[in-house]
Amino acid sequence: MSEGGGLRRARHPPVWLAFFVATSLLATLSLSVSAQVAGDTIPTDSAPRDTLLVPIPPEAVGGDTIPEALRAEAASMAGMAEIPLMPGVGAPGWGSARWEWGPEELARLPGLTVLEFLELLPGMTTFRPGGFGRPIGLTAMGMGGGRVRVILDGFEMDPLGANAFEIETLALLDLESIRVERSLSEIRIEIRTFRMPEPEPFSTVELGTGVFQTRVLRAILARGFGDHSVATGAFDLGSTGGIGIREQYRHSSAVFRWSAAPAPGSGLQLEWRRTAIDRAGTVYPRETARTDLVVRGRQELGDRITTEALVGRAFEEDREAERRLEVTQGALRGIYSAPSFSAEAAIRGRSLGEGGAPLAGSEAEARLAWLPTSSFGLELASRRMAGSDLSAVDSRAMAMMTPIAGFTVFGSGEFGSRLVPRVEHQPALPSGSSGASGELVVADATGWRAGAELAAGASAVGVAAFATGASPSIPFGLPFDGDGVPVVVERSTGLETYLVAGVPRTDGAVRLEGWYTYFPGEAVRPYTPVDLGRAALVFQGVFFEGQLEPILRVEGVRRGRARVFSAAGQPSATAPVSHRLNLSLQIRILDVEAFLFWDNLLADPAAIDLPGAPAGSSRIVYGASWRFRD
């Protein structure tokens, strides 16, 4: 009965869909009526202004009746402060291949996880998707596996038991901003956690449900204590019965963070984070629990320098393989930030516990961005990694020039090598389990990228050519390619473009946006599709002075044919061509938001190509979130 019920819900959209469509129509009608009323002429007041002013003697004014206790509490809350921010180095944009989402942008993105947000960015793609809750690999620009770094408030979320951290398990409501830098040798994801927007207590609750018994529950609560301390707690729970209600999955993420700013420009923070994954069924079952403990301190030195010191420990227990992985990490970094120049220097050290993943024992990194004029910019970066009697250095340089307003040309180059983790611990077949083993691999990190961008108002178009020498190609270290052997590949070239254009006569409310990446020739490099792209039509309106905001997005996604590592460890399998049509609708009224995410509307079976998993089907999730203050 449960299986049949799940399939019936997949074929017939829920009643909520009709509710959302009706709400959108009502919003449109309300807009028309509002515009008509706004156009009417309201007569001005014809009464003469009162010119009589009666002064009130000071002695006639009564004293303030606000109790002293309330006055002290208000003054305390007005002076409440979080720990200092660590500013980013380098401006986001097409030329720098760097993108950043703040709190408002994150609230408007369609998707249930951070991983789904990242797929929206140019060149980003996933491989071996098996549906919500199954293992999945993220890559870009022909890099292969092992090239994703996740840095959470300065603490790098080291992968334990795989080549990349499972970013889809992060608690969404606990994220303040996401900054993504896509070079030709790695994907660097810098995440800033939640900060109180106002002194008053703040909380948000989000509930969602959908087909295949999908459930989403999220919550966050933050409030101040005393003069200069803030406590934040967040919880994120996602579960599903899987396609056909046969592959149950559940993950939970809990976060507690205490921040203290005893003096202006200084702060101390303690953070505890625990993530549990329970993947049942027959397609790569897994039951793990990961805990991260971090202590960080920050200090501003003047108006432009901010320093940070942190130490943290991460350990993971895998009940399927009966192993424990752990790593201890310490880091020091400093950032200088000025309008025309910014620089960052950082060192990081690790102590690997027994059974830990292969990671660099020490790292040193320096980055700078120089903008002497509004028409010229230069960025330089270098990083040294050492571990397991190996070392590698990779460097990058980028220049941008704007000869005329709105037109920018850019070029970047990378050279050197880097250490890439290779883990082969997980079962080659779904029915088995094994212990962890792995090694560090010295991989080439050379390549170049050059192109141009033309921007006018809210519209922009950009093109770029690139070449990557990232070799060897490393598997993701996930169950479907855990026995994969690194493969030496030749240099690959490609072309990419993006477009954002407002639709005429819509006052910017309707826009087209998309991107496309093309690799000429046959799909030879593993995890590198012949082509991939996204195209979307987006409506975003703001009505009644910001009290009503509907967002409707319809997009098509294509991923071309690509070679992938098979369970036998060789890049001999082929991922099929996939076409998906997605729809998302979000309606915010004041502090309440309703959402509907309908992925793979046409049920393309190739949307899921994980070995052993059922064919792709539509996924419908809908729900609402409430934001509370005080």
Predicted regions and their residues:
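Outer-membrane beta-barrel domain signature, especially the mid-to-C-terminal portions
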Residues: 419-445, 469-498, 517-534, 559-586, ...
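Short loop/turn motifs that connect adjacent beta-strands in outer-membrane beta-barrel proteins
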Residues: 196-201, 225-229, 263-267, 300-306, ...
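Extracytoplasmic beta-strand/coil segments of soluble accessory domains associated
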Residues: 57, 67, 71-99, 115-155, ...
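Transmembrane beta-strands of outer-membrane beta-barrel pores
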Residues: 207-211, 237-241, 272-278, 311-317, ...
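Short acidic/polar hinge/loop motifs at secondary-structure boundaries
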Residues: 155-182
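Flexible loop and strand-edge segments within Gram-negative outer membrane beta-barrel domains
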Residues: 240, 245, 265-331, 357, ...
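Outer-membrane beta-barrel "beta-signal"
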Residues: 592, 615-630
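Outer-membrane beta-barrel translocator/receptor signature
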Residues: 185-190, 196-254, 264-266
